[in-house]
């Protein structure tokens, strides 16, 4: 491993810090250190050790980084949260992962190797907590389920905790509906994309069809139907005012913007990269009843109203959707995605999940999918899920994130989920960062459209 060290002051204690491992008690008297290095895999890592270490190290897993994008190591969600945690005495570590994209097979070992590197340099922590955001929530949960001996607890924030198979199935459903209802004769390929160039071509064609459809009442109704199949909320951008509950037009406009984003990146470009790793198409909709799925969506009322306003028959469109040729998966690709990226729900240490209610990228119903897995896996008592009343993906305040960490720590210390109600989390958030928002609320998400886990009855492809 290679290392590059920067310390705040060049003192004898800093020299000792570089020269030998030490215990948490020794670390409390040392100078703060910032360590950057690389792992044998090629991943970069980042470590921040505070001057007065409290003995806890936080292993942070970052979100999805597309192929071709910069991929620096990260050890916290944002700078403000990082600084407050360092001020409170936490050591912060994290890696870049060796590759970009759907990199779970690199991410998990790279994160554990980063923890090993930390221990070699600074000595064993009194306690290790794993935490992560977005795709990093998937990585964190994978560590929690498969490497529980390495951590005392875990925190998933806006996490992709429905797992990989369910994620890609639910990414397929809205674009399948868009093609069937807006461009049935277009020849747009939804899976088996082959190359980045093919994916980009299909994404552009679909985005064009959606953009054109948004100009008519009929098109807007059909876009709302596609959004409902993915449970895209009608308020998903925190920079915009929250629409009134029955402001269907404003809600649909927000869903349209989110769907365009889904088409431009996850549904085609990111899918193609994941298919390459999986060795084929890992998604299917054989046997899927979209009428039933829409009936379970919290956005059914909006779809019904917009269809009525457009003078369209929802029943007729659902029949057309039911007749559209279905897509079958490659069993080997499903097996790869299931083995690497799907959960059992079997926890042995406590995990806290937090999620915003207005998340369009990983809709809040992902939490229902993991609750289902935890129930089947027999670990419901170890899981708590709490919700923040805000639009957007991972749009937590600094206080809300630190409140979640402190709540998890209490569970690790006491064996009980004490002070974990929304009102308690809000109090913790205000205490941690008085100027930041505290928006936890009592909330129960709807069911996930198509869950898939490794502990429930067979969820696999049919047909």
Spans of model-derived segments:
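Secretory targeting and sorting signals
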Residues: 1-29
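C-terminal His-loop and adjacent cap/lid subdomain of alpha/beta-hydrolase
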Residues: 30-463
């Amino acid at each position: 491993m290679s290392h590059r060290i920067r310390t705040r002051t060049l003192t004898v204690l800093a020299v000792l810090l570089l020269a030998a491992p030490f215990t948490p008690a020794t670390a409390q008297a040392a100078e703060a250190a910032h360590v950057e290095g690389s792992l044998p895999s090629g991943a970069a890592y980042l470590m921040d050790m505070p001057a007065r270490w409290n003995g806890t190290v936080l292993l942070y897993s970052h979100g999805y980084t597309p192929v071709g994008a910069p991929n620096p190591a990260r050890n916290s969600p944002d700078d403000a949260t990082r600084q407050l945690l360092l001020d409170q005495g936490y050591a912060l570590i994290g890696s870049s992962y060796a590759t970009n994209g759907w990199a779970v097979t690199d991410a998990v070992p790279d994160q554990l190797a980063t923890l090993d590197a930390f221990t070699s340099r600074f000595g064993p922590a009194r306690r290790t907590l794993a935490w992560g955001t977005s795709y990093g929530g998937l990585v964190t949960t994978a560590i929690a389920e498969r490497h529980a001996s390495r951590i005392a607890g875990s925190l998933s924030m806006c996490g992709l905790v429905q797992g990989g198979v369910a994620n890609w199935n639910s990414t397929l459903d809205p674009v399948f509906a868009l093609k069937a209802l807006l461009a049935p004769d277009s020849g747009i390929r939804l899976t088996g994309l082959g190359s980045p160039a093919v994916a980009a071509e299909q994404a552009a064609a679909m985005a064009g069809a959606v953009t054109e459809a948004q100009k008519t009442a009929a098109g807007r109704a059909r876009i709302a139907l596609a959004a409902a199949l993915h449970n895209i909320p009608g308020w998903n951008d925190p920079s915009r005012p929250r629409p009134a509950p029955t402001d269907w037009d404003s809600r649909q406009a927000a869903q349209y913007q989110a769907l365009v984003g889904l088409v431009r990146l996850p549904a085609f470009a990111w899918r193609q990269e994941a298919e390459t790793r999986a060795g084929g198409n890992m998604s299917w909709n054989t046997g899927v009843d979209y009428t039933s799925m829409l009936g379970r969506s919290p956005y059914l009322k909006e779809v019904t109203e917009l269809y009525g306003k457009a003078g369209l028959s929802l029943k007729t469109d659902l029949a057309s959707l039911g007749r559209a040729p279905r897509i079958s998966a490659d069993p080997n690709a499903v097996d790869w995605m299931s083995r690497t990226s799907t959960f059992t729900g079997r926890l042995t240490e406590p995990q806290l999940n937090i999620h915003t209610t207005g998340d369009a990228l990983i809709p809040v119903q992902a939490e229902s999918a993991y609750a289902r897995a935890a129930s089947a896996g027999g670990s419901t008592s170890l899981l708590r899920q709490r919700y923040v009343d805000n639009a957007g993906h991972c749009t937590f305040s600094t206080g809300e994130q630190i409140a979640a960490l402190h709540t998890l720590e209490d569970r690790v210390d006491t064996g009980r989920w004490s002070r974990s109600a929304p009102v308690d989390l809000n109090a913790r958030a205000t205490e941690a960062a008085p100027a930041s928002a505290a928006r936890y609320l009592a909330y129960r998400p709807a069911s996930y459209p198509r869950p898939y886990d490794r502990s429930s009855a067979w969820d696999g492809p049919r047909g």
